[in-house]
Amino acid sequence: MVMNENNSIKMKWHRIVVLTVLCLFGFSLMATLAAPYKKKKRPKTDERVYLVHADELRYDQWGAVPGAQILKGKVHFTHAGSQLWCDSAYFFQVENSVEAFGHVRFKQGDTLSLTCDHADYNGAEQMMHARKNVVLKHRTQTLYTDSLDYDRMYSLAYFFEGGKLVDGKDRLVSDWGAYSTATREASFYYGVEMFSGKNHITTDTLHYDTRTQIAHVVGPSTIKSKGTIIHTTDAYTNSRTDRSQLFGRSTIVDGDKTITGDSLYHDNSNGDNNGYGNVIYVDKKNKNEMRANRLFYNEKTGYGYATDRALLLDYSQRDTLWMHADSMKIFTFNINTDSVYRKVHAFPHVRAYRQDVQAVCDSLVFNSLDSCMTMYRDPIAWNLNRQILGEEIKVYFADSTVRKAEVIEQALSVEHVDAKDHYNQVSSKRMDAYFTDGAMRRTDAIGNVMTIYYNRDEKDSVLTELNYLETDTMRMFMSADRQLERIWASKATGTMYPVTQVPPDKLRLPSFEWFDYIRPLDKNDIFEWRGKKSGSQLKKIQRREAPLQRFD
């Protein structure tokens, strides 16, 4: 009988030892899985978890939870400067851990608190697994989730079944995430959304610093704010200042206007947009775009400028116009009204190319109010085999089609008429050209008019005579196929020479120049500036100015 009792006692103790080993192994495995982010071995603390109070305590070594003290009613623990309250708990004193149930409340210092329905706390590794209706509060930040692991040793909280962080006006949600109570930085992964006032960010990866309220998005992301949409793969946005820094070829969309660049800086509070590196500004409504390596545009004032390989494209007509200058500026007047208009300034070294027209000048201004483009300082324009130049050229448009052109002071029009060096030429103080459906139909030359014009044989179009004419005013009418129909002149004097008998000094007007070596050859050639050769510049004429009145 004694031997049987001894055998029975040995078997019971053997079972207790086995169960204890299995429990310890299970807790060790849970701790390992709960902290997959730490590759190095976790240090452990010897500080014990202490039971402060419980209305009821019982211990059942042979019950459902062997090795646990079963606590009920106003349960209170302390550990390493933290406190834990709950309705009931299993206290594993040997393992230095607690499983808490009902109205779980955890507090660490004066800045961190956590509430949930159920929690496991391992005192040795200072790890808490909180489940169901979890609310973590740290300073001014609040994190909501249903599954959270809080690592006190590394001051990190992880959620992995959806969570929401609220920081003042900022609200962030995602599937997975982590929050550091030490640095107050948070990371969010998969299905990430951030709401801040009128701003809305969607991405798959976002890092957020609660101290600065700066969010860093990584990967394909969209930022929406007050009518502006940003597409980016790498950006920093500050919800406090409403500013964003965009990298990795980002795009800002503002209605029918877009800006794309390698690096963009967007200030939503004042509308400033700065771009660096292959920046492209597109105006879909007006069918034009501006490109440069350095570009600025303010969407509220409509002011912008471009430098470093600045390029303007206009595709409002059938063929695209390409224009380059060292710098370009755009000014918008009466913005957000029905009377809005813009001015574009390009300077210096302006070169433009379109298949049917090319131009060069030192500076250019386009005013959309009167649809006038003015070219200053040695302007030259080419159309097919015709060249026109003067001190200043103004071109007026109607629905993106040339309506009128004015050449002011030292006007010269030259047309190359055959394979040999024969040119139709007109020089005057001023020249006006009128267009119909984009084709020049009439030209008026005014003041000190001199002209050389070749007649052709109607049968074989061979040049037959040269007409030299001097007058004060002359009007030329052109056919739709650019042929001269008739000429009107007042008090003209002139001479007609057979082509074979033209004196050498009558082949060219005194102001004749043919600037084919300056003419842009294609859209890529506009970036190479070529000035006039020495001796071919326009004459410098002193203009008399009326003296200012003085009042003594």
What are these regions (language model features)?
Residues 1-40, 552:
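Bacterial Sec-dependent N-terminal signal peptides
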Residues 32-552:
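N-terminal amphipathic/hydrophobic interface segments
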